[in-house]
Amino acid sequence: MMGQRVIYVLTHDSIGLGEDGPTHQPVEQLAMLRSIPNLNVFRPSDTIETFECWQLALESKNKPSVIALTRQKIEPIRTELIANNLCSKGAYEILRNGDNLKVTLLATGSETELAVKVSHKLATENIYSKVISMPCHEIFDSQSNDYKKDILEEGTLKVSIEASETSYWKKYTGTSGLNLGIDNFGKSAPYKDIYKHFELDVENIVQKIKKNL
């Protein structure tokens, strides 16, 4: 409400926390934070995006920011920091497999790596897709309608992948979209086992996408 440049850095942002179990695994907090007015919630996918989100938070002089970071190790989505801050649009395309696109994959944080793997797997079955990294919903929502259409209005199926509560994504995926995430409390197990339990792994996601096409 005061419009101050306060930056909150939050870690251990999902079921990727693993063995500490559901008492320590946030499943509703991203949706809760995103519902707060005048707050930018960043969930970067790798080191490069973290740098860019940090820059945006520093430049946001009249609005507080949250930067939510994962605990587990993830592969980098990008390996080179360029002059143009790609996160400044809130969402951007990081991968396109083929020209005749059927699927748009939307992801944040640690699940962006998962979305990339899903896209590659789909391509082996001649199902072509693009992957959109969406590190900040609030910034994306402020973009022009033309930009939002370029990001969202391509292909026949929109799929969100995030290890969090899923209902928030429906405004992007629509009534016929597929929202994959966590709508229950977490589990205590190695994080890869938990992702598989909640069917947030490549094979399960690919099968769900194929059923919805």
Where are these regions (language model features)?
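A glycine-rich helix N-cap at a beta->alpha junction
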Residues: 1-13, 32
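Alpha-helix C-terminal capping segments
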Residues: 1-3, 34-36, 172-174
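Short glycine-/polar-rich loops that comprise or flank the Walker A/P-loop
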Residues: 3-6, 38-39, 156
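Thiamine diphosphate
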Residues: 7, 16-26, 59-213
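Residue-level "edge-of-site" marker
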Residues: 12, 47, 135
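Internal gly/pro-rich beta-alpha loop/helix module
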Residues: 19-36, 47-48, 52-59
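Short acidic-hydrophobic, aromatic-tinged amphipathic segments that line or gate anion-handling sites
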Residues: 41-44
